[in-house]
């Protein structure tokens, strides 16, 4: 996920773990950032991966007893426990690059479509079977509640919500796609100046939006691709059939960081509220990125 959302977490009393679901968002038009239920899956549904993440100061390593308790708390929805690691490069003696491994535990559902990674400084929940924001937020909060129950979350440094979408449309008779029919004009790049006889087939773009004061930000990465946005060896299973044709990538990363370098106290209610407030600009920008023709097509699927 990219950088980061201003909420005064410290302005309200800290709340302990609870199991009540997040408040329902008010209906404000069509929810385009949804997929289908498992028995309604369309091969061209745009959502490939959704991630919610909370970054926090380093927590104590899980002990044998706390690991057992965490596994028990997550066993109903994420019963499979796996060991995982992230690799990073640092500078070793003499300035030579040295790989370092960040090892952590990951809990997965039986369909291998939802994963919760509990790292020393982050709680990351991902899904390839996204249905809607509220349902996924409930899953995320179950994980956060379980983590907070076995080891206190002492502060919040970043909250993020990320959508990786693959927009697929029919290929023309010449085997190409005129993305101008489907994608909003500002995202089409230099297609309009393509020399005669040549078609623009590749470009990448990025845009960063921030509040005037530190707080919410949104990064959009976009451009056409071939195949899939996710690596074929990604640790989660795709619920849609593999496709190798052209698609248009929309990577929408909405996030929050506290102002002034502060590390506000963790508050469950405000975490849920922040996730909701991050969802709204993601929803808005997604709809703005599509032409009316593509919106109508997605609604028919």
Report residues per predicted region.
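Secondary-structure boundary elements
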Residues: 132-134, 138-157
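Long, compositionally biased interface segments
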Residues: 242-301
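N-terminal low-complexity, intrinsically disordered segments
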Residues: 28-118, 124, 266, 270, ...
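Aromatic/basic-lined ligand-recognition segments
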Residues: 31, 35, 102-107, 158-241
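Glycine-rich, often proline-containing surface loops adjacent to acidic residues and nearby aromatics
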Residues: 46-53, 114-130, 156-164, 245-257, ...
């Amino acid at each position: 996920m990219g950088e980061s959302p201003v909420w005064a977490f410290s302005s309200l009393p800290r709340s302990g773990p609870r199991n009540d679901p997040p408040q329902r968002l008010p209906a404000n038009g069509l929810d385009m950032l949804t997929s289908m239920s498992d028995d309604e899956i369309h091969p061209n549904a745009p959502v490939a991966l959704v991630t919610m993440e909370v970054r926090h100061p380093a927590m104590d390593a899980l002990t044998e007893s706390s690991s057992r308790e965490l596994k028990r708390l997550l066993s109903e929805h994420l019963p499979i426990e796996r060991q995982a690691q992230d690799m990073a490069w640092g500078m070793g003696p003499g300035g030579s690059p040295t790989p370092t491994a960040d090892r952590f535990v990951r809990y997965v559902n039986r369909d291998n479509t939802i994963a919760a990674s509990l790292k020393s400084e982050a709680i990351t929940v991902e899904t390839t079977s996204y249905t809607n924001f509220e349902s996924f937020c409930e899953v995320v909060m179950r994980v956060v509640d379980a983590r907070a129950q076995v080891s206190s979350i002492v502060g919040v440094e970043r909250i993020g919500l990320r959508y990786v979408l693959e927009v697929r449309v029919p290929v023309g008779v010449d085997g190409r796609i005129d993305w101008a029919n489907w994608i909003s004009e500002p995202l089409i790049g230099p297609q309009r100046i393509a020399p005669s006889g040549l078609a623009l087939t590749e470009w990448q773009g990025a845009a960063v939006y921030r509040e005037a004061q530190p707080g919410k930000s949104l990064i959009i990465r976009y451009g056409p691709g071939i195949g899939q946005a996710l690596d074929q060896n990604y640790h989660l299973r795709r619920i849609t059939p593999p496709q190798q044709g052209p698609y248009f990538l929309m990577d929408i990363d909405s996030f929050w960081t506290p102002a002034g370098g502060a590390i506000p106290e963790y508050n469950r209610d405000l975490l849920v509220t922040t996730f909701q407030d991050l969802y709204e600009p993601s929803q808005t920008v997604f709809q703005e990125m599509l032409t009316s023709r593509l919106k109508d097509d997605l609604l028919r699927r």
